[in-house]
């Protein structure tokens, strides 16, 4: 991301298709900042333990918005998790950071099947310049990537403008 500003609120929307009926139980999603810290959005438990993805075995996330201000925890949701959910860890951990740099979505897949994932970061900053990425609008920095096998997949967004994160929300679509 090349825009300047300090994060005051960050959300992320994710669309993910695992390609496997019970695929979510094999996935863990983390957002990594350009400054080395990360937030876990949600995790699977291939042994059937809970909590994970609302205890659901569904394989996909559709227009799933990870937002600290949501009243529903991701683990209390139901597949395909459309709409806003609180992530496993707080996105406010990014508050006060600069928005500028390369953001990565880390997908850990432990079952060997592939899929696709795309994400869009929606951020509010304390910058005096207008926010080019208003919540749930268009024009957000986003990325899409396919994953396969038992591997880790990174999706990166480059933000080059200076600024500090004050709130971070993430939308993930697993398709």
Positions of the model-derived regions?
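Loop and turn regions of beta-sandwich accessory domains that flank beta-strands and are enriched
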Residues: 1-175
């Amino acid at each position: 991301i090349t825009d300047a500003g300090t994060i005051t609120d960050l959300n992320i929307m994710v669309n993910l298709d695992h390609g496997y009926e019970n695929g979510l139980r094999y996935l863990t999603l983390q957002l990594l900042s350009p400054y080395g810290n990360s937030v876990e959005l949600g995790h699977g438990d291939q042994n059937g333990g809970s909590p994970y993805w609302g205890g659901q075995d569904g394989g996909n996330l559709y227009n799933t918005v990870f937002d600290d201000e949501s009243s529903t925890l991701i683990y209390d949701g139901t597949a395909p998790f459309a709409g806003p959910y609180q992530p496993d860890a707080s996105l406010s951990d990014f508050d006060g950071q600069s928005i500028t740099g390369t953001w990565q979505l880390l997908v850990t897949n432990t079952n060997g099947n592939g899929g696709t994932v795309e994400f869009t970061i929606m951020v509010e900053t304390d910058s005096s310049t207008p926010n080019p990425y208003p919540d749930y609008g268009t024009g957000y920095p986003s990325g899409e990537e396919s994953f396969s096998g038992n591997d880790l997949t990174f999706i990166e967004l480059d933000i080059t403008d200076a600024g500090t994160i004050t709130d971070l929300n993430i939308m993930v679509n697993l398709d």
